[in-house]
C-alpha cells in the first residue's frame, strides 16, 4: 500500500486560518489573513475543513464585539459572578487571611512563628538547611498556619505538588517501540528523581513571579505536604535526601504529615527517631481544633451568610452547631462542609428534620420522665445525621478514659439503687462505653489488655480494690488464652478486663469522689521485652544442652536449677555462664526491675509480630526492631553454629542478650560475701 494512499496530499489552495489574530481589536478593518497550503497533510482533512467557516465567523464576531458590551450583558456577567460566589465552597470562601482568624491555639501559632524567625529570618550564612515536621489530625490548620505566617513575615513558599504522569496510549507505545523509531525506550523519570531535582532547583533558584506575587524578599521555605508514593515503599531514599539537604541546603524544608490511628503511622515510617536526631528535625504537633474555637468560627460564618443569603439558607440554632462541633472530631474543614451541606434549603434538609425530631423527642420525654437517657440517645443519632466523622482515639487517650473512669452523678429520675446486700457494687453511671473506647483505639483487645495490665495499679488508692481488679484481668486472660476460641472470645475478654478494672476502683466509683485526678504517666507493657528474653533463653538452652534431649521449658525450670547446685563438670564456659544466669537468682535489690518506656500521647501501640498479628505501623511487612518490641534475634544466627558439638562451642555462640562468662565471674565475686560460693568444676580430659 503506497504512502500517498495513506496520506493524500491536499491541492494547493487558500485555506482560511482558524486562529483569530491576537491584536484583532486594534485592526477592525483588517481582513483575515490566509495561508497557502501547498502540501498540507491531514488524516481527515475534509472532515476538519467542514467546520472551519462557522468557527471563523464566531471568532470574528466575538473579536469585534469584545470591547463594547451592552448593559444587559454586563448585568449578566455580574449575575454569573454572584452565582459562582454562592456556589463556592465555604471552606474556600471563608479561609483565614490573618493569624487572628486561624482556628488554632495561640501557643502552636507562636511555636511555628518562632521557628520561622529563627531558621529563616535570623539564619546565619553557610549554616545548612533545617527541617521542620508538622504533625496533627486532618483539618486542624497545619498548612493554613504555615502559609499565613509565611505571608505575614514576608517569606516565600515554594510548595511541592506531585506531578501527574502523562497517560500513554496504545498507539504511543507502538510508535515509540516501532522498528522505524529512533529510540526504543519509553521516556520516564522516577518520582524520587523528580523530587530530588525539585529540591535542588528550589534551593538554587528563586521562585518565578506570578500575577499578584510579591518577590521583594529572597527569604523562602520549601513546603512538602504530598510526598511521592515511592517514599512509603523505600523510606531510606527520603532519609538520604534529608541528610543531603541538611548539609548543602540553603532554605528550610517543612514537611506536613497528618496523624492516623487506623494503622498507617506515616510519621514513624518516614521520620523515625534516629533520623530526627541525626538531621536535627524540629517537630511541632498540632491538636484537634477545640470545640470553643470551632464554635466561634462557625458562628461567624453563619452570621455572615444569614446577613447576605438569609432567604437561601436555613440558619441553624446554637444546639445544632454544638452537635456539629461534637461530630466533626476537631476537623474544622469537615465541620464547615457539613454546615454548608446541612444549611441548604429544601424539603429534605437535615436541619428541618432535626427540628421535627426535637419536637417529637420533647413530647416523649415529658411522658416517660427519662429526659437524660433520651437526650443522650438523640444526640448520638443527630451527630451521625449531621455527617459526623468516625471518632478515633490514640492509645494514650483510650487508656486514660478507662483508667480515670469518669462518672456522671445519678438523679432521682434514674433507676433505683441496688438492694442492701448488693450495696458494695453500687456505682454512678459511666460517661463512656468501654467497648466503644477500645474500638476507637484500633487496637486488638488482647493487646489493649496488656497496656491496661501494665498501668492499672497506679490508679488505685486501696490494696483491697486491686484484688478484684487482678481477678478480672486473670479471667480475661483465661478467656483469650485458648487459641481455638480466641477469635470468638477476644471481644468478651476485653469487656471483662475494662469493665472489671473500672468497677473495682471504688475510689472512682462516684462522680463526687474521683480518687485524685492528677496526671499519671502511662508506660508500655514489659511483656514484650520479657517474651523476647524468654525466646532467646529457649534457643540458647536447646543449643547448649542438646545432649539432655529435653524441651526448653523443662531445661529452664527443672534441670538447670539443679545443675547450678550440683558439682557436675561442664564442657565449656558458655554452659557455665548460662547456668549461672538462669539457674539461680542473684541477691540484688534491683533484680527484676526493668526499665519502663513511657507511652506518648500520639504513639501507636506495639504489636508482637510473632503472635500472628501484623504490626499496625509496618503495612503488612515485618516490623523493625524497636525498644520494648519482641524480635527473633536468636533465630537470625547461623544455624550451623547451633548444630556444632558442645565441646566446640564457645561463649560467643550465645545470643547478644545472654551474659558472657567474664561478666558472670564479676557477678560471682560481688556476691561472695552474701552467699556461699557455687563450685562448678571444669571438664578436664587429661584426668579421665
Swiss-Prot record:
Which residues does the record give as ATP binding sites? 136-143
Motif RAD1-binding motif mapped to chain:
17-25
Q: Where in the cell is it found?
A: Nucleus; Chromosome
Q: Which GO terms describe its biological process?
A: DNA damage response; DNA repair; mitotic intra-S DNA damage checkpoint signaling; negative regulation of DNA replication; protein localization to site of double-strand break
Question: Can you tell me where the transmembrane regions are?
Answer: none
The Gene Ontology terms for molecular function here are: ATP binding; ATP hydrolysis activity; chromatin-protein adaptor activity; DNA clamp loader activity
Q: Where is the composition biased (Polar residues)?
A: 644-663
Q: At which residues is Phosphoserine found? A: 85, 358, 647, 657
Its main localization is nucleus
Q: Where is this region: Interaction with MCM7?
A: 431-688
What does the PTM comment state? Phosphorylated. Phosphorylation on Ser-647 and Ser-657 is cell cycle-regulated, enhanced by genotoxic stress, and required for activation of checkpoint signaling. Phosphorylation is mediated by ATR upon UV or replication arrest, whereas it may be mediated both by ATR and ATM upon ionizing radiation. Phosphorylation on both sites is required for interaction with RAD1 but dispensable for interaction with RFC3 or RFC4. Phosphorylation by ATM in response to DNA damage promotes interaction with NBN and recruitment of the MRN complex to DNA damage sites.
Any one annotated GO CC term = chromosome, telomeric region
SUPFAM superfamilies attached to this UniProt entry: P-loop containing nucleoside triphosphate hydrolases
Compositionally biased tracts (Low complexity): 342-351, 619-635
**What is the tissue specificity?**
Ubiquitous at low levels. Highly expressed in testis, where it is expressed in spermatogonia, spermatocytes and spermatids, but absent in mature spermatozoa (at protein level).
Outline the segment boundaries, as ranges, of region: Disordered. Answer: 63-84, 342-379, 605-688
Sorted UniProt keywords: ATP-binding, Cell cycle, Chromosome, Developmental protein, DNA damage, Nucleotide-binding, Nucleus, Phosphoprotein
Family in the record: Belongs to the rad17/RAD24 family.
Q: What protein name does the entry list?
A: Cell cycle checkpoint protein RAD17
Recorded source organism is Mus musculus
